[in-house]
Structures are given as C-alpha cells and as structure tokens.
Amino acid sequence: MPKFLTMIRWRWPALALIASLSLAAFAGCVSLDTQQRKWIFQASVLTTQDEGARIDGLDDVWITLPESPRKPKLHGLWLAGPTPDAPVMLYLHGARRNVESSVFRIRHMRSLGFAVLAIDYRGFGRSTDELPSEDTVNEDARAGWAWIEAKHPGRDRYIFGHSLGGAIAVRLATEVDDAKGLIVEGTFTSIPAVFQSMKWGWLPITPLITQRFDSAERIAKVKVPVLVVHGDADGLIPPTLGRALYDKARTPKRFVLVDGGTHYSTNGRGQRQYRDALRELYGLGA
C-alpha cells in the first residue's frame, strides 16, 4: 500500500474528529463528547463467534468492577513469566487494539523477563460493551493493577502502555505508590498536541477537546523511574512527542529511539535496546 494511503488509513479518525470539532465550534453539538470518545478510542468488540478462541500459552482472566453501577467485567490475558518470581507487568494497549491483537507484544515482554497481565478496557474485546472515556479506562487500569496485587503479592510490578495506553499508564503511575517503574512506547504528551502536530493543527479546536489525556502535565508527578521508547519511523505519533514527554519526566529516566521502528514494529525491532535500558534503569536482567 502506498505510504500516503497508509497515513490516511491510520489518521482518518483524527481527520474526522478535526472536521467534527470545527463544525461544532460554529453549530454546537450536544454529542460532541460522545463522538470524540468514539473516534479517539475506536473500540473493537469481539463477537460471540470470537469467544473461546484460546491463545496458546496464555490464560483468560476476568476482573469485575463491583464499585461501578453496572458492575462491568474486564477480560484480560495472563502470560506467566520465565521464572516463578518474575516481575509482573500490567500491559495497557492503545486505540483500536484488544489484548488478542496485542499478543505479539505481550510475548516480547515475556522474553524481556516479565510475567504479563494485559487487559481490555470496557468497550474492547470481550469486556463489557460500554463506550470508553478517559475516566473509565483509568478505572479499568486500576482494576487490573489491583488484580495483580491480589493474585501475585510480593512481586515487583511495572506499568507498560503503548500509544494511547501510554497516556493511561502515565495517569495510573501518578495514582499508585507500589510500582517499580513506568514504561511507555509510541506515546504522546496530550491529545491536543497530537492534533497540533498534524498539518491541520492550526485549526482552533483545542478548547473543544474533552478527552485530553494530558500526560505532559501528569508525568512530572511520577516518582518511579521512567522509560520512554519511540520508533524514529513512527508515522502516527511523531517521535518528537515522545521526546517531549521524556523531557517532562523526573530523573531517573531513559529515552530510547529505535532505528526504523514504526508505531507497531518498534517493540520487536528494539528488543536489544529494551534489554539494555531495563538493565541500566531498573537492574533487570543483570
């Protein structure tokens, strides 16, 4: 597929959101927040025909949120670590994806020494079908963190987020005090900054964005070591946004730029650099 068509394919939701916000600025729209949530998350629900498709080596996990009115259930995948006492990673995926389409990256993380719990937020995969928001995905991330604490007490825990999941991970890291580290890949400083990085960024729509995911403001509050990874060929989230997020973080921290890494290939291409950074920043795999 030609490069310009690939760019349009992946950025079409962003273009649609820009167009909608511009129109709403003049016409007004009571469903503006709803439309933003649909376009930003692009939630992918699995049908009943998809259910029960076991993935070799991974176990299904179900987590209930009893505090929420509907008592929603989250589906997740658990991949045991290479050793019984391996550190545990909470894996938070990005927009459009679900845990089953993230298995390749989950396995990469195990190869780096982690046991991994990956969760689907409400509205994704087999989790309760509900339109996600910035607040509900945060609740879901906290539920996943609590599950790890309950099921694997005493083990070191790390938070990982890819793309939009990186913003969810940053927020979670500001709200828990028992993480050993925060790792984000292919992520950004804020949703407004993503739009401003595009050729249409001059449009005056920033005040209309309700799902802001302001990681740049939050990451300065993160007290654990931070690893920021980005591919230098990422055509969806510019590496400059990953670097800007890194610049806002406290020390100790590390920025890794993976040569030739795209938004989806960076994790695989950067395994050696990941190992080096994990050893230097967290003492893992030493």
Label every PLM stretch briefly.
Residues 24-66:
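An N-terminal hydrophobic leader/cap segment in hydrolases
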Residues 68-147:
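Membrane-embedded segments
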Residues 105, 215, 224, 238-247, ...:
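Short alpha-helix in the alpha/beta-hydrolase fold that links the catalytic acid
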Residues 152-163:
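Alpha/beta-hydrolase fold nucleophile elbow
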Residues 221-223, 228-230, 234:
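Short beta-strand/loop motif that positions the catalytic acidic residue
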